[in-house]
Amino acid sequence: MSHFLPTLILTSLTLVAYVLARMIYNVFYHPLSAFPGDAFFCATGLTKAYHMIAGDLQLKVKDMHDKYGSVVRIAPTELSFSYCSAWKDIYGSRGGRELSKFYDFYRVDEAMPQHIISAGKAKHSILRRYLAHGFSENAMKAQEPVILDLVNLLMQRLREHAEEGARVVDVNKWFNFATFEIIGKLTFGADLGNLRNRDWHPWVKGSANNNMVVGFMAAANSVGLGPIIKWCISNEILPRQKYLDELAEMVQKRTGVTVERPDFIQGLLRDDVQLSNGEIVANVEALIGAGSESTATLLTGTVCALLQNPDQLAKVIDEVRSTFRTEDEITLHSVQRLDYMLACLNETFRYYPPVTNGMPRVTPKEGAIIGGRLVPGNTVVAIWQWAICHDPALWKDPYTFRPERFLEAPEFSTDVREALNPFSVGTRNCIGRNLSYAETRLILARLFYYFDLELADPDQDWFGAQKAYLVWDAPALNMYLKPVVR
């Protein structure tokens, strides 16, 4: 025992000395030491991981951009950019080459097969080619009756619960019911019953926990602490496994259907694709995750921002009610005429981006030119949506909701609209872009056609109270919906 204590002390001191030496090296001598950033972020990845788990990392990154400029160091081996040109430099293709994804971030579960978001370039190309069938114009036309039926049911449920404007309705909850229902149907024909039963399907209810776990694991993996964090949150991971098991059962039912359907995974079931059941499940999870909660967040954010800005609300209501004489005229095709509503959605993407963080890539060993600067090899790089969308050098009055900036308004002539890319750019941009715009415009057009809306608590700081874990942890948005009398 007398020999053990000195050995323990010496070992502890050696470990502390190593950690301090490593932190000093990271701050002053690392290849990225020339790039500015707060010292604790530059010294250790634990700082970034802490704020990601705390849900305020997007604010910290924005603060550093305000302090240091358009490129900042947010971890020992990671940079954030708010250059407009960095979109193509990071996510585009140059001479047939593109920066690889930072797979420690995207592969949060090593047991999960690669999917459309996490796959390498070659695998992604194959998956996207076969999934493209489900997102084609013909497929969307074939699926339009399904979407219209569910949107009509959403409006019916809102009308029932609104009680002629006398009862408070949480539109965030109902938008989530609808978007999960729609993406479940479109992806693999699942009938989740959220709207029909007026309550969460147990599997959908588990998605909130799933998104939180994915956010935690992405943060941990990005700084090499995946196994430790996985052990610490093991009780939270158990519901995720149940979520995946139930999803696998639903996918199994769909793969047993021999009749061809126009849903998204039909292209993955072709004999020449040869995907395992696990790979199909992984892709279904990715598609549902990308097309459900983020779409509901966009809808809720747009409605909240409009109700907080009466002039803009009046314009979008006038556009909807002057364009359509009957509800049957409001279709996926006809809503494309709603230019002001499209501007509102684009402004919401900027003002309240559903995904706040960066989608990280990694530079090759020889380095890469990004934003006109040489970035050393093996550096994680990304554009953080919250930072670039609120950069006063790119947007006039960035914390003000003004859809007019997307309609050539002279007062916003200095805005750099090319800085907004909510669906990313390049060969790996979001495959569901057109569906997202069509679905959200359809729901909002029906909503403003049927109802006059009023916030239940006009003083609620709905936007300011939220944390972000890959997507926003959005609270209830309660309002009164009074049916329009015609």
UniProtKB/Swiss-Prot annotation:
Leader sequence segment: 1-21
Positions bearing carbohydrate: N346, N434
One GO MF term: oxidoreductase activity, acting on paired donors, with incorporation or reduction of molecular oxygen
Keywords: Glycoprotein, Heme, Iron, Metal-binding, Monooxygenase, Oxidoreductase, Signal
Any Pfam family matching the protein: p450
Keyword Transferase: no
Cofactor: heme
Residues bound to heme: C430
InterPro entries registered for this protein in UniProt: Cyt_P450, Cyt_P450_CS, Cyt_P450_E_grp-I, Cyt_P450_sf, Cytochrome_P450_monoxygenase
Keyword Ribosomal protein found: no
Family membership noted in the UniProt record: Belongs to the cytochrome P450 family.
Summary of the function given for this chain in its UniProt record: Cytochrome P450 monooxygenase; part of the gene cluster that mediates the biosynthesis of aphidicolin, a specific inhibitor of eukaryotic DNA synthesis and DNA polymerase alpha. The geranylgeranyl pyrophosphate synthase GGS is required for supplying a sufficient amount of geranylgeranyl diphosphate (GGDP), the general precursor of diterpenes. The diterpene synthase ACS then catalyzes the conversion of geranylgeranyl diphosphate to aphidicolan-16-beta-ol via the intermediate syn-copalyldiphosphate (syn-CDP).
Protein name as annotated: Cytochrome P450 monooxygenase 1
